[in-house]
Amino acid sequence: MSFIREFKEFVMRGNVIDLAVAVVIGAAFGKIVTALVDKIISPLIGVMVGGIDFSKLSLTLKAATVDAAGKEVPAVVIGYGDFLNTILQFIIIAFAIFIIVKMINKVINKQPLPPETPSEDVLLLREIRDSLKK
C-alpha cells in the first residue's frame, strides 16, 4: 500500500474528521468565551467590586528606574489580572462543556434500546423446547 493511500485512508476515517471539526468549533467557541469574559463579565464584576479592571491588576515587585547611562529599566511586574480572566474563561468553558455533555447523556439515555433479536441458536433451542412440550 502506498504512503499516500495510507494517509488518505487515515484522514478519511470518521474519527479524524470528527476531531478536526471539534477542534475548529472549539477554537471558535474559545474566542466567543474570551470576548464574553473580557468585554462583558469582567467589567460587570469590576463595577460590582468598586470599578476594578481585572486585566490591569498587577503586583509591582520592583519599580521602574533609570540606570547610570540614562536608560529606563522597566518595572518588574506580576500581571495577575489576566490570569484571573483566564481562570474565569476556563470556568465558563468547563461549565458549558458540562451542560453539553449532560444534555447529550440525557438524549442518549432517553432513547429506548432496540429489542434484542435472539440469535439463530436461541431460536432453534426455543423451537426444540416447544416441540418437546407437545
Curated annotation (Swiss-Prot):
PROSITE patterns hit by this protein: MSCL (PS01327)
Single GO MF descriptor: mechanosensitive monoatomic ion channel activity
Membrane topology: Multi-pass membrane protein
Signal peptide: none
A Gene Ontology cellular-component term: plasma membrane
Gene3D superfamilies: Large-conductance mechanosensitive channel, MscL, domain 1
The protein, known as: Large-conductance mechanosensitive channel
Annotated source species: Xylella fastidiosa (strain 9a5c)
The gene coding this protein: mscL
